[in-house]
Amino acid sequence: SLNIELHKMTVFMIIPKAIQDLALPFVDRYFTAILSEAVQDGLVQAYLNGDGKNAPIGIMRQINTTDTDGTNKAKTVLTTVKKFSPKGLAPIRKTLSNNGLRTVGTLYLLCNPNDEAEYVDPALYGEALTGGYRNTSFLPIEKIVDANVPAGKAIITIEKAYVMGLSSVSMKTYDQTKAMDDADVIIGKAYGNGRAIDDNTAVVFDVTKLEEYVLPVTQVTTPAS
């Protein structure tokens, strides 16, 4: 069957009429930029953790399993990822391969800015023998840092694994709604939906379990002659 259910995304802003009366050239661009940023932020939240009831199904949620309130259940958080080594990433790569049915290339790691500084970078980068720091991962990992990722959790996903459709964003100004406050209300809205192609396209893990990378050093003792 074809599911054509759509969800409405709404953004709004209240603007004092006095600002409009000034007719400064940058005012319209400034308000448009703020509303555009709000739309983008809403789309990111929906992609990450949309509840599937009043929003798209986020990659942190299960597609076909719901709670009693009608929202899609959160995925189980993996707590065994401690290193970005072949062994450390094996459980994640096995899941992303969908039980061996697809090849996994570049991994995309989504994390909160605080967790990037405290956990991700110390585990991902290490001192090189020649000085400086290097990426210690054995395969490509691309970081995507966003404040919408919940602190303490991170997600590893793959490309071309999420489908989202969105209508154009329409903006309308209401000049009487807040008349007593001498203000205009601008409301923008769009319709859309989205979901991952399957539950195995993204893995949520406890980022606080990551261990700092330590350069392995082997001490060799030369036997006395």
Please report, for each region that a protein language model flagged, where it lies by residue.
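Extended oligomerization regions of viral-like shell subunits
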Residues: 53, 57-190, 214-225
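Short helix/loop capping segments that flank catalytic or ligand/cofactor-binding pockets
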Residues: 22-24, 118-120, 195-197
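Beta-strand elements of well-folded, non-transmembrane domains
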Residues: 41, 190-194
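Tubular lipid-binding modules of the TULIP superfamily
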Residues: 199-201
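Alpha-helical scaffold segments that mediate packing/assembly in large oligomeric complexes
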Residues: 2-93, 204-224
